């Protein structure tokens, strides 16, 4: 089913969405404008060579998705160009995601690890939402180091980091390319059910409440509570 529009709680969200629609003739407004909400909007086909493109340089803080393309003859060249584009053209350094087939990772070999190392982002997710890094208290969460008060972008410093890493640069998260049970048919031994943070997981609220209870007192007896709910794949 279709999820309803989310509340745009950032001040000025409605005006920013309207400005984007007015300045981009190809903008697609996905929803009818609901009362007191901001409709989801998509702007496709931006020119990656346009250094003045506002959507590359400003954070919307509203449900606007934009897409662009970069050249590349083969995965290796494409990945290098994509990393360069992100580092040099996009404003903000908090999180980035690479969606990549496991076979491509294997084919690229060390070049894939080099690409991760070159990305100037505080959290890099490989086939997983980078925001999971915020949910894991062990990982440092913050912008890539190097911002100043004159150009603060995504901020300075870190939160969480319960393992007390000294001067961390970035966190890298890996997730399964195939969701369970399809992963089993592809030879990937991952048993991850539909993640509880997915909007279509009907058990998400129950799972997260029970995991919160476990985090509160670390009583192993609480573990059987959320696991059966998770195994139901959000049904």
Which residue stretches match the model-derived regions?
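NAD(P)-dependent aldehyde/semialdehyde dehydrogenase
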Residues: 1-94, 106-107
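C-terminal core of ALDH-fold dehydrogenases
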Residues: 35, 78-202, 206, 232-234
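C-terminal non-catalytic accessory extensions
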Residues: 207-235
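Hydrophobic transmembrane signal anchors and adjacent membrane-proximal interface regions, especially
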Residues: 4-10, 14-15, 26-31, 174-179, ...
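Generic surface-pattern signal
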Residues: 1, 19-26, 117, 121, ...
